[in-house]
């Protein structure tokens, strides 16, 4: 497997890998990484669909990419996905996945057209004082000292960031800025999370720094991600004869690692309908393992019931399976680095369905758009700056579900601090019913206090979800804590998803999951085509200059708070580039 960039590799079709007709694949889980691996096995690996087996413990595919209407409960979206125009693997695959809405059109086509015709941008990024614009006004509000803290992290070698926290590099100069308000709420970072991952994020999205305050950097699907992404992939795979095995729980994968140069997956231990079973493997049976799980132990509440906070990892779950696998070889990772402290990895979301028109005027007042036009509404999350829960909420294009009533609006609410009492509902979010969470949200969007309870009870249906391990992948880590996608010496197995190690890309993204699937297939089948490299904006001087200026709210280098000696050094340096292309470039991007 090798990385590539450019159209030469992107538009090429690989030859059929040698011996692929004699191989089979067993994929543990049916999340985005697993489905991507299956798609690449079929499209580029040219494996017969009937030889590809997806083992899913539940009744539906999709993993964390969900979006369902549950009978007697309501609509539930545990999370949402923010996409980037340089998710290179994602677009490489979706150009080949047919739309399930429009014949002759790919998922990429419909996504591209939608975001061209209805580009994303926010008209209100944050509120305070019960629905008033917080007037962050597109500013990062970072001091020169704060900018230097970010720069220090940016240039620190990855090896020196192992097991380091964000607070090891940032103090209040950054953590009290608009930059951190935008960043932590957009990506769900906490102060105690991995400094290494923070650096990777800054480098990965350096080309989008200017688009973070108003979300012009982002693109979204038409519907929820289950309907817009998962279902088209499933239909594509089914059309090629791929075998979906629901109700099959993988408990362990057994390996022979006696020869470090030839590590073999020998058996998959499963439960089928509660009965123990096993799948014996040969070298021609490839195993794709989704290890860990950010939505494991998730629980749903209801309008009148809180979501349970279940932190005990059960036998037979994704973490338990990874622990059993990791015990067999040190190269298979260290799961407990990520799942040992749910107080540092949990947050909650809630899906609010409006049932009449009473709440809509308050939404319009903040986002300055009508949510029923079918176009962009909030354009990304609106963060309640003075919320004790650090609440954010968003409304994507409506409807979010194909069967959603036309006069109902779906709002996604999430909060990072589930253990703090609310500002109106004096309880921690984790102890609140859906109705109570809706009341807290209504309070923060400016609904009169004497109307809040009635509106939450009769004008909305709210379903809360607690996810104890949703931020597990952000915990401080060292190299080796996550297994490589294909570990050294592997003959017939690999790891997929957010807890597999691949260089330069960032976790908690659709792209990361899909990239691990592509890399796994290309490595095990020796597919003779390049995997698109992570977009290289961090190596583009234009993007670096632009980001430097935008991060400092347009402040030029010559306007920095410098000592007399520093000013003299800068003046002398600028004199050396007078009349050169370097000077033109610095002026073009506002550095001088």
Language-model segments: residues:
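Extreme N-terminal leader/targeting segments of oxidoreductases
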Residues: 1-25, 43-51, 69, 551-592
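Beta1-alpha1 glycine-rich phosphate/pyrophosphate-binding loop at the start
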Residues: 1-3, 37, 41, 45-85, ...
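N-terminal glycine-rich phosphate/pyrophosphate-binding loop and immediately adjacent elements
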Residues: 13, 19-149
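Alpha-helix N-cap/helix-initiation motif
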Residues: 30, 79, 83, 222, ...
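Rossmann-like flavin
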Residues: 100-207, 218-220
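Glycine- and aromatic-enriched mobile tails/lids
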Residues: 121-122, 483, 499-511, 523-592
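Helical element adjacent to the flavin cofactor pocket in flavoenzyme catalytic cores
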Residues: 203-286, 290-292, 304-305, 310-319
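C-terminal segments that line or cap access tunnels to active or ligand-binding sites in enzymes
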Residues: 206-221, 284-286, 291-516, 522-539
């Amino acid at each position: 497997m090798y990385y590539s960039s450019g159209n030469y590799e992107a538009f090429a079709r690989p030859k059929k890998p040698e011996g692929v007709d004699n191989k089979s694949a067993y994929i543990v889980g049916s999340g985005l990484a697993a489905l991507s691996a299956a798609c690449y096995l079929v499209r580029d690996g040219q494996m017969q669909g009937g030889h590809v087996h997806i083992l899913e413990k539940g009744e539906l595919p999709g993993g964390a990419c969900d979006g369902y209407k549950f009978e007697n409960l309501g609509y539930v979206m545990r999370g949402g996905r923010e996409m980037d125009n340089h998710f290179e693997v994602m677009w490489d695959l979706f150009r080949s996945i047919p739309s399930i809405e429009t014949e002759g059109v790919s998922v990429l086509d419909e996504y591209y057209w939608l975001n061209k015709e209805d580009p994303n941008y926010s008209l209100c990024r944050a509120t305070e004082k019960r629905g008033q614009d917080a007037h962050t006004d597109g500013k990062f509000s970072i001091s020169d000292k704060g900018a230097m803290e970010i720069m220090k992290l940016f240039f620190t070698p990855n090896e020196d960031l192992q097991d380091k926290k964000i607070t090891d590099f940032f103090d209040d100069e950054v953590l009290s800025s608009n930059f951190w308000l935008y960043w932590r709420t957009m990506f769900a970072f906490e102060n105690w999370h991995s400094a290494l991952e923070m650096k990777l994020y800054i480098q990965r999205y350096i080309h989008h720094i200017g688009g973070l305050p108003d979300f012009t950097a982002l693109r979204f699907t038409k519907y929820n991600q289950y309907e817009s992404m998962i279902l088209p992939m499933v239909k594509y795979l089914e059309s090629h004869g791929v075998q979906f095995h629901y109700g099959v729980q993988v408990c362990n994968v057994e390996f022979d690692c006696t020869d470090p140069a030839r590590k073999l997956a020998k058996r998959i231990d499963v439960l089928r309908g509660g009965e123990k079973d096993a799948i014996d493997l040969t070298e021609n049976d490839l195993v794709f393992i989704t290890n860990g799980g950010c939505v494991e132990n998730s629980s749903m509440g209801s309008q009148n019931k809180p979501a349970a906070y279940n932190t005990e990892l059960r036998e037979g779950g994704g973490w338990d399976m990874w622990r059993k696998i990791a015990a067999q070889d040190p190269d298979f990772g260290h799961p407990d680095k990520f799942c040992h402290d749910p107080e540092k990895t949990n947050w909650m979301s809630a899906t609010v369905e409006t049932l009449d028109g009473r709440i809509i005027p308050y939404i319009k007042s903040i986002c300055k758009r009508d949510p029923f036009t079918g176009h962009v509404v909030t354009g990304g999350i609106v963060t309640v700056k003075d919320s004790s829960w650090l609440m954010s909420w968003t409304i994507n294009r409506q409807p979010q579900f194909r069967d959603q009533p036309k006069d109902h609006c779906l709002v996604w609410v999430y909060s990072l601090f589930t253990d703090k009492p609310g500002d109106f509902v004096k309880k921690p979010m984790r102890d609140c019913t859906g109705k109570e969470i809706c009341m807290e949200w209504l309070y923060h969007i400016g609904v009169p206090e004497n109307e809040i309870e009635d509106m939450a009870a009769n004008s909305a249906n709210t379903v809360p979800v607690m996810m104890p391990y949703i931020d597990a992948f952000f915990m401080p880590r060292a190299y080796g804590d996550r297994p490589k996608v294909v570990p050294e010496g592997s003959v017939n197995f690999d790891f997929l998803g957010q807890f597999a190690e691949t260089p330069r890309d960032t976790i908690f993204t659709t792209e990361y999951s899909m990239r691990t699937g592509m890399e796994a297939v290309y490595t095990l089948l020796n597919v003779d085509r390049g995997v698109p490299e992570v977009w290289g904006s961090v190596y583009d001087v234009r993007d670096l200059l632009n980001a430097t200026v935008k991060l400092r709210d347009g402040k030029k280098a010559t306007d920095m708070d410098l000592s007399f000696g520093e000013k003299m050094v800068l003046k002398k340096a600028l004199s050396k580039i007078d009349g050169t292309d370097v000077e033109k470039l610095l002026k073009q991007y506002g550095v001088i």
